[in-house]
Amino acid sequence: MEKLKRFLPEDQYEKLAAINNPYLHEFLAEWIEWLKPSKVFVCTDSPEDEEYVRWKALYYGEEKMLEMPRHTVHYDNYYDQARDKANTKLLVPKGVTLPFLNTMDREEGLKEIREIMKGIMKGKELFICFFVLGPRNSIFTIPAVQLTDSAYVAHSEFLLYRKGYEEFKRLGPTKNFLKFVHSAGELDERKTSKNLDKRRIYIDLVDETVYSANTQYGGNTIGLKKLAFRLTIQRAVREGWLSEHMFLMRVNGPNGRKTYFTGAYPSMCGKTSTAMIPWENIVGDDLVFIKNVDGTARAVNVEIGVFGIIEGINEKDDPIIWQVLHSPVEIIFSNVLVKDGKPYWNGMGIEIPDEGENHSGKWWRGKRDKEGNEIPPSHKNARFTVRLEAFPNLDKEALENPCGVEVGGMIFGGRDPDTWPPVREAFDWEHGVITMGASLESETTAATLGKEGVRAFNPMSILDFLSVHLGDYIRNYLEFGRKLKKKPKIFAVNYFLRENGKWLNEKLDKAVWLKWMELRVHGDVEAIETPIGYIPKYEDLRELFKQVLNKEYKKEDYEKQFKIRVPELLAKIDRIWNIYEPIGNIPEELFKQLEEERERLLKAREKYGDYISPFSLL
């Protein structure tokens, strides 16, 4: 405490002295001394402290005001527009190897990051902010402290997370908190990070601390988002619960019944559009904690806000988000085009001006970057940051419930043109975890990999954020379900089937799949048993299409969508098997489930041929 007293003005020192936690004080003293900020501000939970951060984001030029009240815009460096996978490393003890993951020797990594961060905040203001992941004062709560010299990062976290200063006071001398140290580093004249060659995001799994330097892009800097996620996955696997990359939503059943679903979808597979279906309710769009509470799986949204991709959001397809983005609620737009104080983005469905300011500085149509690429009006990864309370379809009670909500179903959403049917239900927990969650793939489009139709393996949509061995992660999933008295049903969906180049489903058909899943959770409708799980009966879907979309659902459409495509399904089993086999430390159950599914498909092929009509299986 003596050190802190030396570094801080009295009013800021008193805020820290009110927290009885020597571990926290020691950590803060060490880093304030190392970073050498010219000024330190400690954020409590008061609205005044939040307002101070908001004002500082404008004062330091990291954000600018827009025409609509409470809207601001932030720009990242032209070359700092996405998660930096190459320089995001998990620091692990010598000799530890984790397949698929970018690891580095811990001692080496700590030495390098300390060197980069030495005195990096000279002439800058350090903000010390306290937050919690999950609701406060609950079995889900994980406290976290963020050190940053970016008022934009601190402001973003106030929109995305619950404040945690009082929680730190309540908890007293605990070591059980996550730590984040961030510096944007030296800034250029546009107030964006300059030294991108020294951009580093190092995640210390031993000390549960994340260091991030010379970057501002949210995915690299907003500590509590995907950086904390790596730490909570490790914790969940160690302690026997689930920390997942999933939405949490309420599907409204007959007679006012409320059923909650979680959903894991790789990007471009329909995650946001599912969570935002207009007549259902959202609890969260990105991260959930799921715990066993008295034998039941209960889930909470880790966050209270949305850090969403804005590209393509338009009034017709995304009426709810569109309404929020045009309301005078607090929103930070990032890396969009601004003209006359109004934000514009690619694919918004209205005319975009031919000039303005964007992530490249002064912009005009046809402008090219130094590599000769044409610069679009907004970056494809441009974002909006807003609190969930701005959404009219928010289930506020579920968001704030410290006990979480009971999970009725878990959905895994893949993307392929010719393999998975639009919706199906697993036979049981193990079957769902392995053949749906652990087998998740998404077909990439030509734009991302230069090759149409490459299937990217992404189990549980978590591969980019994994911090433990994949085998341990899957083993924990299986164990978690086995200990539940009441298991959620597991479903898989695929909105992207094609035939002769044409989509087999329309965008809103997913609303019907949700209603069917809700009915199945409660055993209200029967289903057809197939080699890959249960699929809906035609009559039930016909009725739901009429009820939900006021649309006639034709028998031939049902047959095309739900036929069992044996050759493609067998090819997928081989692909998944060949990915897991060389890894080692994979649960035996995975190969057992894949083998059983293969046998069921081969048996069905003998009887019905390569492509099986759902009507043959009645």
From Swiss-Prot:
The species this protein was found in: Pyrococcus abyssi (strain GE5 / Orsay)
Cell location: Cytoplasm
NCBIfam families, sorted: PRK04210.1
UniProt KW keywords: Cytoplasm, Decarboxylase, Gluconeogenesis, GTP-binding, Lyase, Manganese, Metal-binding, Nucleotide-binding
Enzyme class: lyase
The protein, known as: Phosphoenolpyruvate carboxykinase [GTP]
PANTHER family according to UniProt: PHOSPHOENOLPYRUVATE CARBOXYKINASE (PTHR11561), PHOSPHOENOLPYRUVATE CARBOXYKINASE [GTP]-RELATED (PTHR11561:SF0)
Pathway: Carbohydrate biosynthesis; gluconeogenesis
